[in-house]
A protein has these predicted regions:
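C-terminal recognition in membrane/secretory proteostasis and scaffolding
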Residues: 2-262
């Protein structure tokens, strides 16, 4: 469960999941995902990590809808028998998205078009907490800290603190700061280029969310000042734990899913 929680955290910290579906991410991989730039966190999602969560959600959905009589394992076995073996026999036997969806519905006996529309072709958040619950697992954000920040990422470049990413909708983005700007000072105090991310966080910790600060930057050798309203730079840290009020049926479902006894 720890590994699943890590994947959930990796996906939930990316803003691109609201912009790009995993179907689009897969299609655009060679022209976008493997050619990342400063706007990548705002625009793209990994079809590897989020794709694994969609597969998890599909597995749990099938298990719930069939009383644990069917799972994603049954779907994968059917795909192998109908298509996979032909590949190793030297036969070209591809499969379309529509055919794959039809097999999933056939094996599970469930109507899953809404699932496909929302989570494969859409950017709707996966209701993982809701799906985990019948398996006796609770999903909670353990990070309750309120941290004032600019919603940027910085790195050291020579003696400069350079802004590498500006997260869309964040404090710096609303103020007008851009990726590539050299961050000089906050309220007249120099931002050190020595371990800049840590030092910037420490410098901003003196403030509260909602306070205004003056950020000074160089943009192509032009000195610029921006008034920034600090926002809560919350980084989720989801954890998965066994539910305190689990029932015997929840425990049984979890054991069938994880294929282990407790």
């Amino acid at each position: 469960m720890h590994q699943i929680a890590q994947t959930i955290n990796n996906v939930s910290r990316g803003r691109g999941r609201f912009k790009q579906s995993i179907a689009e991410a897969s299609f655009d991989a060679w022209i976008k995902y493997y050619r990342q730039d400063e706007n990548t966190p705002n625009a793209l999602v990994s079809y590897y990590t989020k794709g694994s969560l969609v597969a998890l959600a599909l597995d749990l959905t099938i298990r719930l809808g069939t009383g644990n009589n069917k799972s994603l394992d049954d779907v994968m076995q059917a795909l192998w028998h109908r298509y996979g073996r032909d590949f190793y026999d030297g036969k070209d036997s591809g499969i379309t998205d529509t055919e794959a969806e039809a097999i999933i519905e056939e094996i599970s006996g469930l109507e899953l078009q809404e699932f496909f529309r929302k989570y494969i072709y859409g950017t709707v958040e996966i209701p993982l907490a809701e799906l985990f619950s019948p398996f006796g697992i609770s999903m909670n954000d353990a990070n309750i800290d309120v941290k004032p920040g600019l919603d940027i990422r910085v790195k050291r470049s020579g003696s400069d603190c350079v802004v590498t990413h500006v997260f869309e909708g964040g404090a710096a983005h609303r103020a007008g700061i851009s990726a590539g700007d050299v961050l000089l000072a906050i309220d007249g105090l120099r931002v050190s280029s020595e371990n800049p991310a840590v030092n910037l966080e420490k410098q901003l910790s003196r403030y509260s969310v909602g306070e205004k600060v003056e950020a000074f930057v160089f943009r192509r050798d032009e000195l610029m000042k921006f008034d920034v309203i600090l926002a809560d730079e919350h980084i989720p840290k989801f954890i998965l734990t066994l539910s305190k009020d689990e029932t015997p049926s929840m425990k049984e479902s979890r054991q069938l899913w994880l294929q282990k006894t407790e």
